[in-house]
Amino acid sequence: QVLELPGEEPAQVLLKGLPDLLQRVDQVQQRLGTVSALAAPGEQPASAVPGLQPAAALRPYPGVKPLGARERTGLLAAVRKTLPPAKTEDADDYVMPPRIEVYPLTAQQALVFEFSDCGAYICLFDISSRSRTAPYALQPLQMQALPAGSVDHAGGLNYYPETGELSSFLMGRGIGDCGEMASWHFDGQAFQLTDYRRMPTCSGLGYEDWPVLWSAEAPKRP
């Protein structure tokens, strides 16, 4: 691929820091002194590089009883009590009221999504957990953080109580060829990250072809 720049002046790319960068890569991957080293290949065989360690096994999703009508009504009412008073549509500072979704998480806890400031395909959102019984108080929620540089609390969310899978997506534009996507697996105690991919450039590629920055296999329910 040839990079073309405007104008007639030849482009200059400084590679002064490249050797140090490659040496750091070799150090992290433990390739120093081997024939596969990037900065300064040595005489040790490529087999001297330690193999990839298998990812830690995740606990299977234990399943959960669906929310009853009384639980759902109580949860929605408890969340709405925490929201500011709604504005009338003719008010100058009117914003659409948040959309609230509730899901069963464990026998004692529910998962709550609050969506606000929604555009065509992007919302701001908040994730929390509440007790499934009155007064439906907030409960601790353990969730593995996304890698550095990701965008939190913006985009869209989906949760599937049948499988314990939580997914988020942030599209850079409507056709969905750039942005971020992530998936978590609920193991009965915490949400463990199983997939995170990011495509900063809108290039016509579907999310299945985006660079994967994190991957872990979620076990199936027995």
Predicted regions, residues:
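Short aromatic loop motif centered on NTY/YTY
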Residues: L138-P222
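Short, non-transmembrane alpha-helical segments in secretory-pathway proteins
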Residues: Y61-D93
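Acidic/hydrophobic-patterned starts of short beta strands in beta-sheet-rich repeat architectures
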Residues: P104-S116, Y160-L170
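Beta-propeller blade termini
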Residues: P97-P104, G156-N158
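Surface-exposed loop/turn elements that mediate protein-protein interactions on large endomembrane-trafficking
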Residues: K81-E89, I127-A145, H185-A190
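Internal interaction segment
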Residues: V2-G74, D195-P211
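Structural motif
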Residues: A120-S128, G176-A182
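A short, solvent-exposed beta-edge/loop patch
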Residues: Q1-P10, G174, S183-F186
